[in-house]
Amino acid sequence: MNEAKKMKKSITLPFDDNSKRLIIILVVLLFVTGITKSSQFLNVGNIQSIGKQLTEYGLMSLGMGVCMLSGGIDLSTVYIANLCGISAGLIIQSNTSGAAGIVLACVVALVVGALCGIFNGFLVSFLNIPPMLATLGSYELYMGISIVLSQGSTVSADGRFNILSAMTIFGIPLPFILFLLCTVILTLIMSKTSFGNKVYLVGTNAKSSKFAGINVK
């Protein structure tokens, strides 16, 4: 009974003790930096810039977090994001007009990312390749595809797409707001749904989860 309560508690709590300590340390470091470098650090422009840069790594960390909670690891995350960005940039550069081009670029990027994730999942779940080895090989594949698509040169969007990244709502960068929204949605999924509980259980013990009737693949 105690073991069951302990497991349920560990599943439902969003942060363990180590995570809380890490958050406290980061907050203290930010506070100290803000005091010692107040003129350079604590200004609106710098905070907005940090928010924009945090979005990119934050979104990747959300996906990586779910992967690690399930007991795996994904070394190809950065290269998948790179391939998605190149794909979106090429769509925008293809002279697709107006907002339709931006929407199409976003859809293509999401589809490319989903296909890469499905391929990684196939390697791990159905071919039984260890996650580290599978994603170590797939990141080379994604990097090669990115180089071929970009022809080894920089792919950048035009001003239409840059407008979105420069938009702010009450001084908060729009990309950072989207990141917060994704964080809230993923938190609710992982803590309030059966899917989230299954991910935690599979990450804790995949074999026991399989015997419990959970499809670990």
Please give the residue ranges for each predicted region.
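Single transmembrane alpha-helix segments in multi-pass membrane proteins
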Residues: 30-35, 43-95, 122-128
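Membrane-interface helix caps of multi-pass small-molecule transporters
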Residues: 66, 90, 115-126, 149, ...
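Membrane-interfacial amphipathic/re-entrant helices at transmembrane-helix boundaries
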Residues: 2-61, 96-104
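Membrane-helix/interface signature in polytopic inner-membrane proteins
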Residues: 184-217
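Transmembrane helix-bundle core of multi-pass membrane transporters
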Residues: 9-13, 127, 131-193
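Hydrophobic core segments of alpha-helical transmembrane domains in multi-pass membrane transport
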Residues: 22-35, 64, 110-113, 139-144, ...
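Alpha-helical transmembrane segments within multi-pass membrane transporters and channels
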Residues: 96-138
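Hydrophobic alpha-helical transmembrane segments
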Residues: 20-24, 50, 58, 79-83, ...
